[in-house]
Design a protein with these regions (language model features):
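Short, Lys/Arg-enriched N-terminal segments with co-localized hydrophobic residues
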Residues: 1-12
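Ferredoxin-type iron-sulfur electron-transfer modules in oxidoreductases and energy-metabolism complexes
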Residues: 44-66, 105-272
């Protein structure tokens, strides 16, 4: 007869899994890997795993550690904060279900952004790129301006998928052109330029956005690897946006060459 104690040990082993986490207290400190053995439950995601570790921060070999630093907010794949590298692929931790992941599970911070601590990175580069390309709708004052210009239904259908960007940084993480040697803004920012150039009010500043993308780190740095569209959690047609904005940049450059700065007819117009 099988020993009841060994049966319990086997059952416990089958109901647990291993999570390996790359940890670093500060950017200037040494990297260390820690393993945690966690109890399996149905519908478990990576954020819940990190919360379990925070409640009992003991490694697999029994050493007391500290809660893992990470970012999360909405837990609905909307805020973009919980992006990290899971089993070698950048994705959102809130939608990464344990049952669908290869074991042991490996968690690492995004590598294309400066490290803050553990799984937390500084995504200032993305927000500075959005400012550089003026990805917003300018308004005069805070008073009621009344109803704005209408957008054609066909444009609305094109614009809505672009508006779902959550600035997670996955597309920059997977892009071979985003590295310490380049200033490439990345697919997300190019797609946002397309979105705001499409807006009836935003298109008045289209020329400024296109000028920004003609500079260092702009659209010319894209090598069309097409990795970005594969990891976007919102399914945004990033490669279509890159192609569309590339066409806008070419038209803008030709107008600039023929008519000179500030003298281009239809400077705010962009091709459909």
């Amino acid at each position: 007869m099988p020993c009841p104690a060994s049966a319990r040990v086997k059952e416990m082993a089958e109901n647990t899994f291993i999570v390996r986490i790359k940890r670093q207290q500060r950017p200037d400190e040494a990297v260390r890997w820690e393993e945690y053995e966690l109890r399996h439950r149905p519908h478990l995601n990576i954020i819940t795993c990190l919360r379990d570790i925070a409640e009992k921060p003991y490694t697999r070999d029994g050493r007391e550690s500290t809660p893992v630093s990470y970012e999360a907010n909405c837990l609905e794949e909307v805020c973009g904060a919980c992006a990290m590298v899971i089993n070698g692929q950048p994705r959102q931790a809130c939608s990464a279900l344990v049952d669908s992941l290869e074991k042991p599970i490996r968690l690492e911070p995004l590598t294309k952004f400066p490290l803050v601590r553990d799984l937390v990175v500084d995504r200032t580069h993305m927000f500075e790129s959005l400012k550089r390309t003026k990805c917003w709708i300018p308004i005069d004052g805070t008073y009621d301006l009344g109803p704005g210009p209408r957008m054609a239904p066909a444009k609305q259908e094109m614009a809505y998928p672009l508006s779902r960007c959550i600035t997670c940084g996955n597309c920059l993480e997977i892009c071979p052109k985003v590295n310490q040697h380049t200033q490439f803004v990345g697919a997300a920012i190019i797609s946002q330029v397309r979105l705001f150039n499409m807006h009836p009010t935003g298109e008045m500043h289209a020329a400024e956005r296109l000028e920004a993308l003609m500079g260092p780190g702009g659209i010319e740095d894209c090598d069309n690897a097409q990795n970005c569209v594969k990891v976007c959690p919102k399914g945004i047609p990033l490669t279509e946006s890159i192609a569309a904005v590339n066409g806008q940049v070419i038209v803008h450059a030709i107008k600039s060459w023929f008519f000179g700065e500030g003298q281009r007819p239809g400077a705010g117009e962009v091709p459909e």
